């Protein structure tokens, strides 16, 4: 080979390596299944074809017919390997090493296949990872388009990792599929874990096979796999969606130049960014002693779980300055005479460490939930009464070589749709066969009808549904459209809990109460239909929302609102009394809100103008309602349609958030967002949500920012009659604020009546809500606190101050000990119903270890 040829060959190889990085240790492998060519994902990671590793079994390769917008990369999701019989991959490994295994699933439409028929088992060597698994049902339940399952496989005596896919024999035409397989050799990061509730007993995690359930950057932002440590490409998610109760505490952040010193553990345990942020209870020790930080997670019961808590102190430097108790499912992990003391464990600040705790979860100990609670300890009379956490990982341990949990159960409505689909297929087949033999057709038809009636009986039964399922009736993945009309022909199918929590009205009752839906009783019109003023039980005033059969909103939104509102009770959320779903009509019955919508009092109205103080109080009430949805309910709820017509006011000027037909449950165990069809109202719609079709609670924050400017300026969110730059209120107000002439566009009725400091605080809050990046927007807790503070400033200026903000902190960034502090608002206890008080404060405020 000539010198020039060698150089050309070297440069060619070098360019290839730059595009496709080599395996870091000779043991890492990423397979793009169903493709014949090497490719790279968005992070330039190389994905190889899977063909040479597929050793047994017949298979076909397929390409998805639709690319979901939530897919960050087509690799490895758009191609798949399909198995109609058992098949095995054999991947060479170093058997004496632990390995990360990731399985990538995209349950899309593949030509000639019905993804709902895909049920299969996956085994890695002798460990069952998935059993009778349906990626379609799981993604539908999680309201996302794709799924990644991650496992940490213990060392073995085999130098080959055999991954076997077996279609289920319980379903006709069942098949298995896989889009991507990733195998990464990793150092041994596990040892023993203290068994919670048992003194001096441990679980051996070093020999265990584990499934990664949750991996959280507590108090910080998402950390993508490309920024992980040790080459393990793990993704760390923000913890806020998993915080239970309204108390978010404060988020802490070390200064940029703060150094993390890995003295006592390998860097691959967690990246430095995990230890540079934290969440603590806050600066008020008196409040902290009466409350705690609580996280809640949904898991599979009858397994042992390892909770790895990451700690690093970057503020304090002495022992006994901050000590705290740790409880897991109300059992003591660290408390009494051995509370947690980070400096006591590490010796100095800047040194990261972790603690592993193991707990077995069954019906008698948590059921399908794990709660982690932290509260200050008074043992030793520490200098500060506080607790803090930097990171959290939760792993499921294998039981008798099994890690497989059940598929989530479909909602009653989803189950009914499956029955309808199957019954139609059965009728079609019966008709075809009938053309060949009438007697046989009658027999088959009878059998089909019997099966159908049995399945309908199941629908009416008490169907246990996994508690982390999305709100019933919502679209399951982006690109999915409802096939259910707006007319209810067969009645709704609600969970027993929802049906038991609200009243079911007969259609004659509704017609009598609204004078047969007389137009003179119409008090509003929305996307769902008309809203009527009515009377029930002789004297009780109600609002009745009647569906319009031609509306785009239909059964989905109807059931969503019932399932959601029947379980929520809060001073600042409109109360659902009951519903009616008979005679082809769908009606929702609410408490009557005497003063109507907020918008009615802002512009295009003959009603008296609202004072600035009253507007602030209404904004605060609405913020409390949204804050409760995001953090105070059992699971994060995203409203998705926040606007001034969905904020109602009662006769005492108490604001209540309404209209939950588009609401969705928030981020789940596999990500920090929900992938969904974009819905909402133009003018209020979060542009980031519109672009990415990824929904978070920060989308509500954006919409609320528009509401705040609407309150201030008394003009619509969109006004096409104005010059182009003024059409969007959000854009126009932001532009005026940046130029320093915001006062020129505020409501003329308010000019000269708003304290300057109050106006600045209010406008700054609205501006932060409208940040282009959701990550940079405040939480609703932050918004609530700032609005309370703005009201305090106004009352001080007016000489009418009679209340203080609900928490003693500040939502501003404060320089303190080389860190930034962000205080989240704490909602008023008085805003919760007695039921809420009992549930939250009996379990959260003062947990008792067992």
Curated annotation (Swiss-Prot):
The record lists ATP as bound by: 523-531, 545
Q: Single GO cellular component annotation? A: apical plasma membrane
Kindly list the residue ranges recorded as spanning the membrane: 430-450
What is the membrane topology noted in the UniProt record heading this document?
Single-pass type I membrane protein
| Pfam families found in the cross-reference section | Malectin_like, PK_Tyr_Ser-Thr
Q: Which residues are glycosylated?
A: 114, 132, 292, 302, 330
Q: Which UniProt keywords apply?
A: ATP-binding, Cell membrane, Fertilization, Glycoprotein, Kinase, Membrane, Nucleotide-binding, Serine/threonine-protein kinase, Signal, Transferase, Transmembrane, Transmembrane helix
Enumerate the Extracellular topological stretches.
27-429
Identify the main location.
membrane
Q: Where is this region: Disordered?
A: 796-850
Miscellaneous comment as given in the Swiss-Prot or TrEMBL entry: Male paralog of FERONIA, a female factor expressed in synergid cells that controls pollen tube behavior.
User: Function of this protein?
Assistant: Receptor-like protein kinase that controls pollen tube behavior by directing rupture at proper timing to release the sperm cell.
Q: What protein name does the entry list?
A: Receptor-like protein kinase ANXUR1
Organism equals Arabidopsis thaliana
> Lineage of the source organism?
Eukaryota, Viridiplantae, Streptophyta, Embryophyta, Tracheophyta
Annotated gene: ANX1
């Amino acid at each position: 080979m000539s010198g020039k040829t060698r150089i050309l060959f070297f440069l060619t190889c070098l360019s290839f390596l730059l595009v496709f990085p080599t395996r870091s240790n000779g043991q890492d492998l990423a397979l793009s299944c169903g493709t014949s060519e090497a490719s790279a994902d968005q992070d330039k990671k190389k994905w190889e074809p899977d063909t040479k590793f597929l050793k047994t079994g017949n298979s076909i390769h397929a390409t998805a017919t639709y690319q979901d917008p939530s897919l960050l990369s087509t690799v490895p999701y758009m191609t798949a390997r399909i198995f109609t019989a058992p098949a095995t991959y054999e991947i060479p490994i170093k058997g004496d090493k632990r390995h990360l295994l990731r399985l990538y699933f995209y349950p899309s439409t593949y030509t000639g296949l019905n993804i709902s028929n895909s049920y299969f088992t996956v085994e890695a060597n002798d460990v069952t990872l998935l059993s009778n698994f349906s990626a379609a049902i799981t993604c539908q339940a999680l309201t996302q388009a794709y799924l990644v399952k991650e496992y940490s496989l213990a060392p073995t005596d085999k130098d080959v990792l055999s991954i076997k896919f077996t279609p289920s024999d319980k379903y006709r035409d069942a098949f298995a599929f896989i889009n991507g397989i990733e195998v990464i050799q990793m150092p041994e990061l596990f040892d023993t874990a203290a068994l919670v509730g048992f003194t001096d007993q441990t679980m051996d995690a070093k020999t265990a096979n584990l499934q990664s359930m949750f991996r959280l950057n507590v108090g910080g932002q998402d950390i993508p796999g490309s920024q992980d440590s040790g080459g393990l490409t793990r993704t760390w998610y923000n913890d806020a969606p998993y915080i239970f109760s309204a108390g978010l505490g404060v988020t802490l952040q070390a200064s940029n130049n703060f150094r993390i010193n890995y003295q006592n553990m390998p860097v691959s345990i967690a990246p430095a960014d995990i230890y540079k942020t934290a969440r603590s209870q806050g600066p008020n020790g008196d409040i902290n002693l009466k409350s705690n930080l609580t996280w809640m997670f949904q898991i599979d019961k009858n397994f042992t779980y390892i909770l790895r808590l990451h700690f690093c102190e970057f503020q304090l430097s002495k022992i006994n300055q901050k000590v705290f108790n740790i409880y897991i499912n109300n059992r003591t992990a660290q408390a009494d005479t051995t509370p947690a003391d980070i400096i006591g464990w590490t010796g100095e600040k800047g040194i990261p460490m972790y603690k592993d705790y193991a707990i077995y979860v069954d019906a008698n100990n948590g059921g399908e939930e794990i709660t982690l609670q932290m509260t200050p300890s008074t043992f030793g009379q520490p200098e500060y009464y506080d607790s803090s956490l930097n990171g959290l990982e939760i792993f499921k341990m294998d039981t008798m070589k099994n890690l497989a949990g059940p598929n989530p159960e479909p909602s009653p409505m989803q189950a009914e749709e499956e029955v309808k689909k199957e019954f139609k297929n059965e009728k079609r087949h019966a008709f075809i066969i009938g053309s060949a033999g009438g007697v046989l057709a009658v027999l088959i038809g009878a059998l089909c009808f019997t099966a159908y009636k049995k399945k309908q009986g199941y629908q009416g039964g008490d169907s246990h549904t996994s508690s982390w399922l999305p709100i019933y009736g919502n679209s399951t993945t982006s690109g999915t459209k409802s096939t259910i009309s707006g007319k209810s022909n067969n009645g709704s199918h609600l969970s027993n809990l929802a049906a038991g929590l609200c009243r079911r009205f007969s259609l004659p009752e509704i017609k009598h109460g609204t004078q047969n839906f007389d137009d003179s009783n119409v008090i509003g019109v929305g996307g769902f239909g008309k809203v009527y003023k009515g009377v029930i039980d002789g004297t009780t005033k109600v609002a009745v929302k009647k569906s319009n059969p031609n509306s785009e909103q239909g059964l989905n939104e109807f059931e969503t609102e019932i399932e959601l509102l029947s379980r929520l009770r809060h001073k600042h959320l409109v109360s659902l009394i009951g519903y009616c779903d008979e005679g082809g009509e769908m009606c929702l019955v609410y408490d009557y809100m005497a003063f109507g919508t907020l918008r009615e009092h802002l512009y295009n109205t003959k009603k008296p103008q609202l004072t600035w103080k009253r507007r602030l109080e209404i904004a605060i009430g609405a913020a409390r309602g949204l804050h409760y949805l995001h953090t105070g309910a059992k699971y994060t709820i995203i409203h998705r349609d926040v606007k001034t017509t969905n904020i109602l006011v009662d006769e005492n000027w108490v604001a209540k958030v309404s209209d939950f037909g588009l609401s969705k449950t928030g981020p789940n165990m596999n990500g920090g967002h929900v992938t969904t069809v974009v819905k909402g109202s133009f003018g209020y719609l979060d542009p980031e949500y519109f672009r990415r079709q990824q929904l978070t609670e920060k989308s509500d924050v954006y919409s609320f920012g528009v509401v705040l400017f609407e309150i201030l300026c008394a003009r619509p969110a969109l006004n096409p009659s104005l010059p182009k730059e003024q059409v969007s209120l959000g854009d126009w107000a932001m532009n005026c604020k940046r130029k320093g002439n915001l006062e020129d566009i505020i409501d003329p009725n308010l000019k000269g009546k708003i304290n300057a400091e109050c106006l600045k605080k209010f406008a700054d809050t609205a501006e932060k809500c409208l940040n282009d990046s959701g990550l940079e927007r405040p939480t609703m807790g932050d918004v609530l606190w700032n609005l309370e503070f703005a009201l305090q400033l106004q009352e001080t200026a007016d000489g009418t101050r009679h209340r203080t903000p609900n928490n003693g902190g500040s939502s501003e960034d404060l320089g303190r000990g080389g860190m930034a502090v962000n205080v989240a608002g704490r909602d008023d206890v008085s805003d919760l119903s007695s039921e809420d008080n009992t549930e939250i404060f009996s379990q959260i405020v003062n947990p008792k270890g067992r």
